[in-house]
């Protein structure tokens, strides 16, 4: 399937605008995975990360459904359902990613830090911007670009967990519980 050239233009425009700003906001949150933050449940940082991400996603894709799934003692996850568009009549697609981070290392170059997003020479620096935080923003931006171009896409389900950096101990449980809805 070839895509209209305006899809790529739309992605580039979004990436340099709202998507980049959303990713910068994500970098600012020290959303360390539970293995690195024993207070993850009481401090609410992982949940806040999902709330902020869902808010950004709702602005981008108002037709999508965003649900934060919480269970005591288990890091929260964000489940998303994006309705089919353009009359697509195929099987649904499933995207996975994570929005938790490893601890901040030492040794940042001058002017850079883990929780301070900086664009330098066309590159974005900050903790979580490449492993795997960008995935959330890229996935939703790509779907939006398809819709703006009038391209068809299947129903899309996404699961973004906050425990990948600690081994994804509860990922199988989340997928099993969500399977009837996918």
Residue spans for each PLM region:
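N-terminal helical capping/dimerization or prosegment-like subdomains
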Residues: 2-105
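Histidine/acidic-residue-rich, glycine-tolerant segments that coordinate divalent metal ions
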Residues: 153-182
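Active-site metal-coordination/substrate-binding segment of hydrolases
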Residues: 89-160
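Short, small-residue-enriched loops and turns at beta-alpha junctions
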Residues: 42-43, 133, 163-166
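Secondary-structure boundary motif
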Residues: 59, 145-149, 176-180
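Predominant activation on well-ordered alpha-helical scaffold segments within soluble catalytic domains
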Residues: 24, 54, 137-140, 144, ...
């Amino acid at each position: 399937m070839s895509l209209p050239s305006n899809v790529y233009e739309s992605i580039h425009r979004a990436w340099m605008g709202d998507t980049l700003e959303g990713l910068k906001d994500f970098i600012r949150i020290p959303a360390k995975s539970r293995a690195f933050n024993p207070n993850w449940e009481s401090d609410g940082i992982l949940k806040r990360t999902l709330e902020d991400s869902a808010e950004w996603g709702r602005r981008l894709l108002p037709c999508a459904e965003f649900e934060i799934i919480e269970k005591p003692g288990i890091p929260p996850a964000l489940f998303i359902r994006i309705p089919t568009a353009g009359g697509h009549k195929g099987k649904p697609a499933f995207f996975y990613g994570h929005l938790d981070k490893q601890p901040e290392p030492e040794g940042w170059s001058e002017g850079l830090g883990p929780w301070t997003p900086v664009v330098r020479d066309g590159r974005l620096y900050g903790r979580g911007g490449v492993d795997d935080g960008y995935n959330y923003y890229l996935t939703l931006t790509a779907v939006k670009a398809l819709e703006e171009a009038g391209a068809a896409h299947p129903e899309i389900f996404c699961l973004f967990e906050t425990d990948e950096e600690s081994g994804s101990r509860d990922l199988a449980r989340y997928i099993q519980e969500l399977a009837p809805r996918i």
